Amino acid sequence: MKYLLLLSCSLVVAAPAWAQGPKPMTSASWLLCDEDGNNCGNVDGARTLLDDEITVTATGLWQRRDKIGQSISVITTDDLQAIQGPDLTRALERLPGVSFARSGGLGSQTSLFVRGANSEQLLVTIDGVRVEDTAAPSGGFDLGTLLSGGIGRVELLRGSNSLAWGSDAIGGVLALETDTRSGARGSLEYGAHNTFDANAGLGLSGDRYTLGLGGGYTSTDGISAFAGGAEADPFRQWHLGGRGSFGLTDSLKIVAAGRYADSKIDFDGYPGPFYNVFGDTSEYQTTRQGSGRFGLEYASSALTLGTGVALSETRRAYFDRSAGSAPSFETSGRAVHADITGRANLSDQWSIDFGGDADWSRFSTTFDPRQTARLVGAHALLGYHGDRLSLTAGGRVDDHDRVGSHTTLGANGSFKLSRDWRLRASWGQGFKAPTLNQLYGYGGNVALKPETSEAFDAGLEYGQRNGGGHFAVTLFRRDSANLIDYRFPAGYFNVSRARAEGIELEGGAQVTERFKVQASYTYLTATNRLTGKDLARRPRHMASVAADWTTPLGGLALGADLRLVGDSFDDRGNFTALDGYGLVTLRASVPLGAHLELYGRAENVTDAQYQTVAGYGTYGRSAYGGVRVKW
């Protein structure tokens, strides 16, 4: 039996905390949940599509994941709570095709590689706002500044998808949402290296409004960023965020979201007097990040429209205590984004998704005067969604006032072989416009062309993640061209070509009512096609296993995680090797009544010695414990 549901933006459906089931959802489209497909949930008598069976990264509008041919993974609120802790990379590394490199402890510069793509080729959004740092040399987002507190949902699309998202979506799209569960909640955690993490949130909803607010504070004495260092490099951050909506009519509503984070971290570098040997220094960095969006959304059975204006700004300052209290270097980046997106339902099976957007970005540094750029784009996708076959194809045109126009195409399809089996495939192009820093900063080159990519993947899936068992195998390839590289002293040039290809395996099973297991494995080759060398910090083998058991002892839950990473190289010449490693985490939690939960974990139980960036420290055996409350 099928139920037609209008999931209009920021409609919040309350779900019991610490329990599997439908999660808070936001959308702007008509969707079908299918009882036979095992993707319907029941909340307060309403039929809802389960949160991990919907996607926003495929087209920019909400869609059923089983109607899409692209590779998409979802991390839910329950997943984040089971994993525990402020380090979001511990959740992301469970996903296939994902590896990361970090220059020290929590809060340090963190790069996320999706299927071997450069970290800055991953588009990151928070509540629909693009949050890249336009003043960074390559314009990416530093995931070291993004903690899990206040995050309610994470979605990752693996593969080029500039058709829907424009510039930056070469490696994929990472979309995060603020937690908007109804009720009040809070958590406190303390552990190794004097690490303290506190978070609080509040969710309200009525007939015409929803509101989710949250904030948190994290601090740690940390570890030495320099692996051989004698002094620790501390980190602290406080953050605030919120998301809400108000219905003006049954079909039209106002939506708004905002986030602010203030961070400070010590780091190591090259101390005097010769500045040529890596070691302990007295340097630190402050980062202030703000983002927000205000818009309108209209939804009916025939037409969905959304429009809004968003702002993202990042300010960084670098200090050296040995040189005084004034900053030695500062950067400022800002981007304003305006967009309109929509879906016209032509019939029960045919639809057109469309949109237009404009970005105005600027950057400046201590040594570089302010520079600006404008990027305008429009796209359209024609979709067919039958009972068994779904096809989507479209095109996009972007115009950059500094580097000219660029056209992007893409297509994907899904075919349901039976109730539980489906085939899927996608082909997509990606591009990334040169950053203002690459055009006008130190070593800048105004003749740079956009980086481009062409990606293909094909897969076979069985079951659903929320069912008794699921399995997926995916083959993928991505060819990238015009990659921007820096050569001292000449500067930036379009010189590189790269290929990344491999296979992803993902599966899980609810073995018994109380025991479940999830696992993933990726084999990846990512090479520079000019030199034949492996791309730096891209391991060929990555695997993760997570097992969870809810015991009959008063709700006591036990869990274990295993992360295996193969060998890689730290540099483009493949001279410095990074040895593979294995990490084991043990987790536990127990409810104390209806409103209180105790939890704890031990990370790197075997005290493995490893590095993700040569010369930079990583955590040894560490233990943490905390408490959660809800009411």
Locations of the language-model features?
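Short acidic/polar hinge/loop motifs at secondary-structure boundaries
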Residues: 130-158, 177
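Extracytoplasmic beta-strand/coil segments of soluble accessory domains associated
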Residues: 40, 57, 61-64, 89, ...
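Conserved C-terminal beta-signal and adjacent last beta-strands/turns
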Residues: 5-7, 203-205, 214, 246-250, ...
